[in-house]
């Protein structure tokens, strides 16, 4: 979407006090007169065919887990949010399998963060993720390990294997 606000300023009246420089400039150029004329354009390829509409509110938690692997990021985010809101812990084993064995790295990442949202990431799982080929997962696993280091600083030795990781995201998180 592209938004053409068709307006000189974005500020609301509360942010533009009378007597201020910006207030005088807005009045001088008439920027406050041009309101309610904005447009929103939806930009899409001429051959774009929309997919099926989601009906996630009517789906089971197990069905929502499948959406964590969806190619569309909105579907992944929405499924993750609904899973956590529901608090259905019966799907934790399925999430662990997706986090470690899923084909799509983004699906694995969403499964991992969903497990973390349930406070169900442990050192065993995270050490498996440290060897994942995708650097986003390795960096996320490091981040999830940090609270566990507060519990027992000896766990820091697990991170030594990542000290030479060539990817900058992993190095920065470490």
Task: List the predicted regions and their residue ranges.
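Short, glycine-/Ser/Thr-/acidic-enriched flexible segments
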Residues: 6-8, 46-48, 118, 135, ...
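Structural signature of alpha-helical solenoid repeat scaffolds
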Residues: 84, 116, 146-147
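Alpha-solenoid HEAT/ARM repeat scaffold
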Residues: 76-77, 106-109, 139-140, 157, ...
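Beta-propeller domains with acidic blade repeats across secreted/periplasmic ectodomains
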Residues: 1-63, 74, 84-85, 155
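Amphipathic alpha-helical scaffolding segments comprising HEAT/armadillo-like alpha-solenoid repeats
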Residues: 57-65, 88-100, 119-131, 150-163
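Alpha-helix N-cap/helix-start positions at coil->helix boundaries
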Residues: 73-74, 104-106, 135-136, 153, ...
């Amino acid at each position: 979407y592209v938004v053409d606000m068709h307006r000189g300023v974005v500020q609301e009246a509360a942010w533009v006090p009378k007597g201020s420089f910006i207030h005088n400039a807005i009045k001088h150029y008439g920027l406050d007169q041009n309101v309610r004329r904005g447009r929103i354009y939806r930009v899409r390829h001429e051959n774009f065919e929309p997919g099926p509409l989601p009906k996630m509110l009517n789906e089971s938690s197990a069905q929502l887990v499948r959406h964590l692997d969806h190619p569309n990021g909105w579907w992944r985010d929405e499924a993750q949010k609904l899973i956590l809101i529901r608090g259905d812990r019966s799907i934790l084993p399925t999430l662990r399998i997706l986090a470690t064995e899923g084909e799509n790295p983004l699906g694995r990442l969403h499964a991992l963060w969903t497990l973390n949202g349930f406070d169900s990431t442990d050192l065993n799982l995270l050490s498996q993720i440290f060897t994942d080929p995708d650097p986003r997962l390795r960096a996320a696993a490091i981040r999830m390990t940090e609270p566990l280091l507060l519990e027992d600083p000896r766990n820091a030795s697990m991170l030594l294997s990542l000290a030479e990781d060539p990817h900058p995201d992993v190095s920065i998180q470490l």
